[in-house]
A protein has these predicted regions:
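Basic nucleic-acid-binding alpha-helical/helix-turn surface characteristic of O6-alkylguanine DNA
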Residues: 1-125, 172-185
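Regulatory, non-catalytic segments
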Residues: 127-138
Length: 185
């Protein structure tokens, strides 16, 4: 199996995008603040790819799915229409992870929710930590908006791209959401 790779420049840092023949399967920041954090993310991504896409070869080649991802991100960062339905996603994971990722896509731009609220929405009231783990395993940053999940006290909690980026993304969405002429989503 071949996976196709491209680096996408964004206002908050370069992102590594990987697609399969089915669609986008990974979107990660290439740099993360903190000692060894970048290497940790790369190690985790490689383990995930080995588990869900065996065997695979990574090829540097632009594909229609990568072009659509690049266009989606450009629209998102410009504050114009960016609909997840415009993208084919190939997000492989455990059944509970997939349920959480689907729930994440229902959080409106500029709004946040807690791990506990997602657990309750999934009728798994005691599963806040499991929701957190699934959120952390989200392979498609920004597009599947794990950055919109916060702690039960309203505090910003972990984000694979770093808390500075999480803050930036939430603020970006709130700015565009409050502008009447903009249509972020």
């Amino acid at each position: 199996m071949q996976l196709f790779r491209s680096i996408i420049d964004t206002p908050i840092g370069d992102m590594l995008a990987l697609t399969s023949d089915e669609g986008l399967c990974a979107l990660e920041f290439t740099t993360v603040e903190g000692p060894n954090r970048g290497q940790e993310r790369l190690t985790r991504l490689n383990a995930r790819l080995a588990r869900w896409f065996p065997p695979h070869e990574i090829v540097d080649r632009e594909t229609p799915a990568l072009a659509r991802t690049r266009g989606w991100l450009a629209a998102y960062f410009a504050g114009t229409s960016a609909d997840i339905g415009d993208l084919a996603l190939d997000m492989r994971g455990a059944p509970f992870e997939k349920r959480v990722w689907t729930a994440l896509t229902s959080i409106p731009p500029g709004q946040t929710t807690s791990y506990g609220a997602i657990a309750r929405a999934l009728e798994s009231a005691g599963a806040s930590r499991a929701v957190g783990a699934a959120n952390g395993a989200n392979p498609v940053a920004i597009i599947v908006p794990c950055h919109r999940v916060i702690g039960s006290t309203g505090s910003l909690t972990g984000y694979g791209g770093g808390l500075d980026r999480k803050t930036w993304l939430i603020d970006h969405e709130r700015r565009w959401r409050n502008e009447p002429q903009a249509a972020l989503f």
